[in-house]
């Protein structure tokens, strides 16, 4: 039982503001290292099937998915830059040579405006809630990470969902603050408050189970590795390994919901932009049935390898950086306490 209460005791020495700083650094580093993979993937997709005006595609900065709108069929947007790539590595080399290394982070800054705050809220909320749950039910401490992970993701997804839809609509036509308010008021008058959370359902169906599985397995793997290497605090390598393993497991289990969520996210985004359309977006379960009808049950697990390549390193980098930051602040706080004695 003592082992299960150790995380709660450790977290006491870390203030929420310090958790926020640690998660902010982790979020920025994760975006910096993972975004080039998605930029290259999008460029390869655009080469094989050029984007047309008004169509959406999903852009991932390692923290969360964002809808991007192809606003000009003849424009020179980063995802339309010319190039003849023979593969992933060739794309990396050619982009750096012809466009400069900065091009590997094309489109990143606007997405960080929401991704970083969402990640900070998510990680801080998780740690704080997990401590509370362990204190209140120490006999069931093993499920604290599962409940805290699911709840934290539900909260952050609910807060960010309206902002993401507004950002998507603004991509297609730049709006002043006054025009934006009129647009929001019109949407509320027509469809009610729930219209701001279009696409929330598929996001929650994927992200909440993912988060619950991820944190539950992460804490188990971390504890197991700490015991194996006889250490009370996880090293960077332990956190990195535990993050990659738990992220991979969660990614595989929730892949069907990711396939559905991606398709519906694009569909909802296009409907939000083309306000004149009377078409209604399909429900999550109808989309899932359609995918099975078109491609069989295996269609729900399409893109497994690309998802693992994206999720595993992102989870590993984020959690290991976050744990390193918490360890730094824990030592700093302990030193301050010793000096005050």
Swiss-Prot record:
Classification via PROSITE patterns: SOLCAR
Subcellular location: Mitochondrion inner membrane
Highest taxon listed in the record's lineage: Eukaryota
Enzymatic reactions: glutathione(in) = glutathione(out)
Family: Belongs to the mitochondrial carrier (TC 2.A.29) family.
PANTHER family recorded: FI19922P1-RELATED (PTHR45760), MITOCHONDRIAL GLUTATHIONE TRANSPORTER SLC25A40-RELATED (PTHR45760:SF5)
Protein name: Mitochondrial glutathione transporter SLC25A40
This protein's encoding gene: slc25a40
